[in-house]
Amino acid sequence: MKPYALLSLLATGTLLAQGAWAEDPEVLFKNKGCVACHAIDTKMVGPAYKDVAAKFAGQAGAEAELAQRIKNGSQGVWGPIPMPPNAVSDDEAQTLAKWVLSQK
């Protein structure tokens, strides 16, 4: 029975470690593929994070709006190329939005 307890403990530790990584916005941006179209201060296919932060600066509800766009995608906001929906949870979208808005 003890080997199962150890295995269970190790599995729980692995899940907790993955959860900690999921909270790191920079790791999320890499793991979710955001970096394929975005950079911090350089426009690529999509806008630079700093440009997004500047556009939303001072707007009420900016974090929730950006989180919704990250999760569901958007079109016609930054030009003709749409941003597709992303496979992120609500919490991940919120984490990403908060981090993007902190870029100045």
UniProtKB/Swiss-Prot annotation:
Pfam families: Cytochrom_C (PF00034). Its main location: periplasm. PROSITE patterns: CYTC (PS51007). GO terms for molecular function: electron transfer activity; heme binding; iron ion binding. It comes from the Bacteria. GO terms for cellular component: periplasmic space. The keyword Iron applies. The keyword Lyase does not apply. It is found in: Periplasm. Heme c binds at residues 34, 37-38, 83. Keywords: Electron transport, Heme, Iron, Metal-binding, Periplasm, Signal, Transport. Electron donor for cytochrome cd1 in nitrite and nitrate respiration. This is Cytochrome c-551. It comes from Pseudomonas aeruginosa (strain ATCC 15692 / DSM 22644 / CIP 104116 / JCM 14847 / LMG 12228 / 1C / PRS 101 / PAO1). The lineage of its organism: Bacteria, Pseudomonadati, Pseudomonadota, Gammaproteobacteria, Pseudomonadales. The gene is nirM.
